[in-house]
């Protein structure tokens, strides 16, 4: 097959700038082949190289006594004691999910699960953070239904419980949804598998499903803005098979137990190219591949297609040579392909052979370690103008506006499509704050949450970045867990625009300050840029996934109050309405500054709640919608009415940070008040749970009517 001529148009179609192509010519001293151009394009795009973000990601705190492995591997590894580790990561599948919602979301789940089990962990929990356009937008319902069905279809069939996440709607996502997938697994701390190749002449082995043409160019597509050619990009979306992935998991874990593996890497973005280059680069070795040996499910595939295919359920391994027969037998037992496709070499070369031809011969380090790195121009986001006055609103009408919005409505429509109980270790299912999963065979449990408030980040990237971490800290604390570590999924627009790059820089600085203050180091993550359509960017959305630990289920704080429990707020309420959910949902406004986060107060109040958990019947953090929404959700979830004695729009709906709502048995109220006074922590009694009415200040509504609205609004909006 004749390869196409390398033209400026072909170079641009590969996402390479003219100066980047000149850099390639300088590195290799000649014009690249078509396959080589594809390899450079895949390895130098944002999705694989982090060329616009690397400078700032390096500033994040990533270490601590609990951290076994931080960023740079497939996922982060954190010590949970007793010789065990939790391995976790969050990453995006935004562009594919907009183009082909079901498969885009499904393969996002599959990819993050492989990131976890390629390190030797059995997945125990999944979450997803989803951002969609306005419910009445022509594409939104189709995308929501496809994404949720895809997540459920893959996760349920694979057999991992989905235990949490978030769903939001905003016009900024009309042309670019966000699908951020999280997975966590358990492994023995001394049996972690890494991706760095070692040893010369070691066999490089292809494992799993066969290679097809699906996903060719997917990584490059994920590093570009959308325009009116979006439908043409549908072939770049991968197709997943969760049953094959389940077999791949079992085969990999069995293989790892046989002492056969030198290094292992899943094939994700840029497929065979990225996995081989990363293994060689980390091990300071070259890689030679013979593509004739690659298992193919389609005829006449070219070297270009095989190197850039993003077919799912595939791994690449450097194998101990003497273990070939053992390893082959394991994969044949699981009805999966096992093929030796290359070897490690001492030279700094990435050598690709197909037929009797050399299709690529490149310096391997140039593809990864010396890829372009940019210090993009950025401008600081201007300080938000003061919030315009807010007239007092009927609190019941304010509450109805929130619970009738699909962003804050009950999400049973979503959760019920996910299996949250598979593996039989789920303690708290979706919809009750952080998810909690037992560490099988031990008294311990792990808690999981994902959080961000994009309105805050747009108004004030630094405070919004801090708040995403602080809310994750509170959500873990509210179930009784001690926060351990975090993963970040940075979703932003075009970094070549200084104002967008300024949002990114501000958010990174805020996240860094918060994870340092709250001892929640970033151990893994993902950056998704160019989330724009026709020049319109998404809201800056730096999603934080966080993990906490309970040493036993005795430390668990329940999520439901009991009849007659007293409602109290831990933390100070000043009544901050800027960028609040009430402004957005009731008044259609997004003005004012984001609430500022006092990290000292966050830590102090969180430690206070964990120290006094035995006095508390139930707890939740206060965030979107303030006291009114949190109290209603807590009461309604228990089938109880509610009376809040505080009055005033700002007091009921303000979104001041570092606050928790707790339900306390009347007999324990004085003890908690005494503990708060001794600790110097603000504690305000705000009402009581019980009855069949919801009373906010001086106005009331029947619980049954509000519950009907809350539980029906999501399905009504999506249709």
UniProtKB/Swiss-Prot annotation:
Active site: 47, 93
Keyword Nucleotide-binding attached: yes
Principal localisation: cytoplasm
First-tier enzyme category under EC: ligase
Enzymatic reactions: N(2)-formyl-N(1)-(5-phospho-beta-D-ribosyl)glycinamide + L-glutamine + ATP + H2O = 2-formamido-N(1)-(5-O-phospho-beta-D-ribosyl)acetamidine + L-glutamate + ADP + phosphate + H(+)
EC number: 6.3.5.3
UniProt keyword Transmembrane present: no
Subunit structure: Monomer. Part of the FGAM synthase complex composed of 1 PurL, 1 PurQ and 2 PurS subunits.
Record protein name field: Phosphoribosylformylglycinamidine synthase subunit PurL
Organism from which the protein derives: Cereibacter sphaeroides (strain ATCC 17025 / ATH 2.4.3)
